[in-house]
Amino acid sequence: MPSPSLRHRFGHRIRELRLATGMTQEAFADKCGFARTYMSRIETGGANPSLDAIKVLADALKVDLSVLFTDI
């Protein structure tokens, strides 16, 4: 079986960090200013977020950008 794509691993990392904060996907999407459907696509690897969007994710999670890429 092929390894998960970078987008899927990144999305899983975002979901993992979001869940650690206790936020729902909808609350997290609102905090980021994204539609919930876009957030769902990020978390499932269906979207390829821009660098600006990745910075928004990090800020909403209150983590350094590098944390988003740890262990992916």
Predicted feature residues:
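A detector for short, charged/polar N-terminal pre-domain segments
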Residues: 1-9
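Short amphipathic helical patch at the helix-1/turn junction of helix-turn-helix
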Residues: 8, 19-20, 48
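Conserved hydrophobic/aromatic packing and binding residues within compact polymer-binding modules
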Residues: 14, 28-29, 39-42, 68
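Short, conserved catalytic or interaction motifs in soluble domains
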Residues: 44, 63, 70
